[in-house]
């Protein structure tokens, strides 16, 4: 069945070192890739091993045409797309223009199919531009608020509610409960700048799971549930069933079972 997408979807995942931010972005990337999408991803780790901020960027740029084998459906085809001007000796195609849409092709396969490359000004980087993310998943309140700058108007924000005290703040004896950060996000939602704000209570979730790990996967499940509930065009790419398969093959065997339980719990929060 042919499944095509003409727009791209930007996701930012945020947390602190040790919360599974990088793993979460990789699971989302693998899930979209298996669904036939072109995906770019990157992480900015910083001082992760010292409890520092970690960001994962996932950019779903389009979908392969699954009926055409190795062929592709290049996202965006309009008058503003870059035009192909010449074919080199090695089979590379040189685009004459680089526009704001994603349409340039870089190579021609033996069977006549093309492989896309992105030469646009908007999507040449795997990092999500500020103000362009449609989905933000945060594992810690202050990190969610810090990463909120990446969100577009009307974005979906899924965040954990329980704070994780930064080591430097703990050493100084500072107090931090996350309430001010959550209140700021709720104000953004009330004023319409956040399309939907979903607060996931860490303590309640962990009590139901029976263990205090895999919060990241719980929030992934919650985000997938909201996409499915809202009939998002990306729900088929980032489906619950697809993510189950990714976890089964991408997570260490001893951790598969409780990650699947965490995914199910998060998904059921929204469906």
Each language-model region and where it sits:
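Long, intrinsically disordered low-complexity tandem-repeat segments
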Residues: 75-120
